[in-house]
Swiss-Prot record:
<dbReference type="InterPro" id="IPR018247">
    <property type="entry name" value="EF_Hand_1_Ca_BS"/>
</dbReference>
<feature type="binding site">
    <location>
        <position position="52"/>
    </location>
    <ligand>
        <name>Ca(2+) 2</name>
    </ligand>
</feature>
<feature type="binding site">
    <location>
        <position position="125"/>
    </location>
    <ligand>
        <name>Ca(2+) 4</name>
    </ligand>
</feature>
<feature type="binding site">
    <location>
        <position position="129"/>
    </location>
    <ligand>
        <name>Ca(2+) 4</name>
    </ligand>
</feature>
<feature type="binding site">
    <location>
        <position position="18"/>
    </location>
    <ligand>
        <name>Ca(2+) 1</name>
    </ligand>
</feature>
<feature type="binding site">
    <location>
        <position position="16"/>
    </location>
    <ligand>
        <name>Ca(2+) 1</name>
    </ligand>
</feature>
<comment type="similarity">
    <text>Belongs to the calmodulin family.</text>
</comment>
<feature type="domain" description="EF-hand 2">
    <location>
        <begin position="37"/>
        <end position="72"/>
    </location>
</feature>
<protein>
    <recommendedName>
        <fullName>Calmodulin-like protein 2</fullName>
    </recommendedName>
</protein>
<feature type="binding site">
    <location>
        <position position="25"/>
    </location>
    <ligand>
        <name>Ca(2+) 1</name>
    </ligand>
</feature>
<feature type="binding site">
    <location>
        <position position="50"/>
    </location>
    <ligand>
        <name>Ca(2+) 2</name>
    </ligand>
</feature>
<feature type="binding site">
    <location>
        <position position="20"/>
    </location>
    <ligand>
        <name>Ca(2+) 1</name>
    </ligand>
</feature>
<feature type="binding site">
    <location>
        <position position="136"/>
    </location>
    <ligand>
        <name>Ca(2+) 4</name>
    </ligand>
</feature>
<dbReference type="GO" id="GO:0009567">
    <property type="term" value="P:double fertilization forming a zygote and endosperm"/>
</dbReference>
<comment type="function">
    <text>Potential calcium sensor that is required for pollen tube attraction for ovule fertilization.</text>
</comment>
<feature type="binding site">
    <location>
        <position position="54"/>
    </location>
    <ligand>
        <name>Ca(2+) 2</name>
    </ligand>
</feature>
<feature type="domain" description="EF-hand 4">
    <location>
        <begin position="112"/>
        <end position="147"/>
    </location>
</feature>
Length: 152
């Protein structure tokens, strides 16, 4: 990310133009784009990035937060893309049949049988519906993916 882009984004947050993003400016910005962030999370963001301890973020401190946000967005997009590969019918869920089909097409030993796939899904199926939704998929991928589930 170049300095010009960072500066433009920073100015969108820095409403009073004092060169710092205060807690209320951060909160107001998120609110203006329809994202409700709890007060404690706003405080955590500022505390984490506020290197000089003045209770606000200057452009350099903001740069770290912005980079983190961009990386999280990219990770989310990658996860959605991977989820779409497994969710073959596009209904928002990965079934045992879809899992078996994708794992077989990848030439993986894991999940050769429907029963294996059901077991793998049951390890991440938080809501107990027998399928993996996107939220469950993200948790699973952060834990090593479907391959990690087949080991026990």
């Amino acid at each position: 990310m170049d300095r010009g882009e960072l500066s433009r984004v920073f100015q969108m947050f820095d409403k009073n133009g004092d060169g710092k993003i205060a807690k209320n400016e951060l909160k107001d910005f998120f609110k203006s784009v329809g994202i409700m962030v709890p007060e404690n999370e706003i405080n955590e963001m500022i505390a984490k990035m506020d290197v000089n301890g003045d209770g606000a973020m200057d452009i350099d401190e903001f740069g770290s937060l912005y980079q983190e946000m961009v990386e999280e967005k990219e990770e989310e997009e990658d996860m959605r893309e991977a989820f779409r590969v497994f969710d073959q019918n596009g209904d928002g869920f990965i079934t045992d049949e879809e899992l078996r089909s994708v794992l077989a097409s990848m030439g993986l030993k894991q999940g050769r049988t429907l029963e294996d796939c059901k077991k793998m899904i049951s390890k991440v199926d938080v809501d107990g519906d027998g399928m993996v939704n996107f939220k469950e998929f993200k948790q699973m991928m952060r834990g090593g993916g479907f391959a990690a589930l087949s080991s026990n």
